[in-house]
From Swiss-Prot:
Pathway: Isoprenoid biosynthesis; isopentenyl diphosphate biosynthesis via DXP pathway; isopentenyl diphosphate from 1-deoxy-D-xylulose 5-phosphate: step 1/6
Organism per entry: Francisella tularensis subsp. novicida (strain U112)
Necessary cofactors: Mg(2+); Mn(2+)
Pfam families in the record: DXP_redisom_C (PF08436), DXP_reductoisom (PF02670), DXPR_C (PF13288)
Gene: dxr
GO molecular-function terms, A-Z: 1-deoxy-D-xylulose-5-phosphate reductoisomerase activity; manganese ion binding; NADPH binding
Record-listed E.C. numbers: 1.1.1.267
Protein name, UniProt field: 1-deoxy-D-xylulose 5-phosphate reductoisomerase
Length: 385
């Protein structure tokens, strides 16, 4: 009898969760074991009714009561312990780690310690604790497969996904759309509104990640992820602005060859690739019509995109704690911008100041990661008043 692959989706109501569930609807190979959500209980209830998971996880008791009033045939768990449980139970085959922010750290580590196949969309697990997470993955024989379109592209371009080929890599080149303001100079962005920043030209994404794309913080975080995922030094990572988002990333090998992964901008492709790996599954995505595109590229200037400069400097100095500061400060500053408490350009300006002023030792465990994160947020709050 055919046995379906059981999947836990952390962050089921977000954009990655949506695309993951879209893949599941189109195929008959997966069984939803657990769904989690932070605030959108109504949507979670609808998903529970459709996919009938064994578990659902919400952050607190009031949301548990609300969910239980809407659905009755699912076991509802609460908080971090619930997230860690559904990420590590023996029945689970795959964990989609798609919670936004540092809240995704503990359940991702729980999945790694349980030796799971982890589909990683949560950037912060690598950004804030890459050295610790990779150790857990290796120690427990877990699998870590990137879901971000750029890293999944690199994953597909590396020969047999085998780290033995890493000495043959001359450069990993991450492509970036450049966001909605790629053709504007900094002085033109003084009065950018949250609505404008969230209007991404190529991808449908959540508000926070849309702002991150517009500032290129998203790409800066992806540089950190690539550093850990592919065990390469910072000088072997490059960024190119590619407005069409057709080439999702590429690898230059030492013999001068380039291997790139192409496709229309649709998150179902990298998600399906990760879900089915090492095989490929058939999903309904638009074919790439090469006659409709002219592919263009330009340099990602560090002076224009200050987030890249901050992160490359941190990696070159092996200052991993500074990346935690950068990430935490960004989350606070983006939230302040979306709530119209600061101006758009202050997101990077204040982050640059905070990253320079706060100095911590590189964390030795996950508790120290959270401590650096907490102290950074408190400091940013004090700066913003």
């Amino acid at each position: 009898m055919f046995k379906k692959t059981k999947i836990t989706i952390l962050g089921a109501t977000g954009s990655i969760g949506d695309s993951t569930l879209a893949v599941i609807r189109e195929t008959n190979d997966f069984e939803v074991f657990a769904l989690t959500a932070f605030s959108n209980v109504e949507k979670l209830a609808e998903l529970c009714q459709e996919f009938k998971p064994k578990f659902a996880v919400v952050p607190d008791l009031s949301k548990k009561q609300k969910l239980q009033s809407l659905v009755t045939d699912v076991e509802v768990l609460v908080g971090e312990s619930g997230l860690e449980k559904v990420s590590s139970l023996a029945e689970v085959d795959i964990v989609m780690s798609a919670i936004v922010g540092i809240a995704g750290l503990k359940p991702t580590f729980a999945a790694a310690k349980a030796g799971k196949k982890i589909l990683l969309a949560n950037k912060e697990s690598l950004v804030t604790a890459g050295h610790l997470l990779i150790d857990e993955v290796v120690k427990n024989n877990a699998q870590l497969i990137p879901v971000d379109s750029e890293h999944n592209a690199i994953f597909q371009c590396i020969d047999n996904h085998d780290k033995k080929c890493l000495p043959e890599i001359d450069k990993i080149i991450l492509t970036a759309s450049g966001g909605p303001f790629r053709d504007k100079q900094l002085h033109e962005l003084t009065d950018v509104t949250p609505e404008q920043a969230c209007n991404h030209p190529n991808w449908q994404m959540g508000r926070k990640i849309s702002v991150d794309s517009s500032t290129m913080v998203n790409k800066a975080l992806e540089v950190i992820e690539a550093y850990w995922l592919f065990s390469v030094s910072a000088d072997k990572i490059g960024v190119l602005i590619h407005p069409q988002s057709v080439i999702h990333s590429m690898v230059r090998y030492v013999d001068g060859s380039y291997i790139a992964q192409l496709g229309v901008p649709d998150m179902k492709t990298p998600i399906a690739n990760a879900m089915y790996y090492p095989k490929r599954g058939s999903v309904n995505v638009e074919s790439l019509d090469f006659t409709k595109y002219q592919l263009t590229f330009r340099e990602a200037c560090f002076e224009r995109f200050g987030a890249l400069k901050i992160v490359f400097n941190n990696l070159q100095n092996k200052n991993y704690a500074a990346n935690i500061v950068f990430n935490a400060a960004n989350e606070e500053l983006v939230a302040a911008f979306l709530n119209k408490k600061i101006k758009y350009l202050e997101i990077i300006e204040v982050n640059k100041k905070v990253t320079k002023e706060l100095n911590f030792e590189n964390p030795k465990n996950i508790e120290e990661v959270f401590e650096i994160d907490r102290k950074t947020r408190e400091y940013v709050d004090s700066v913003l008043g």
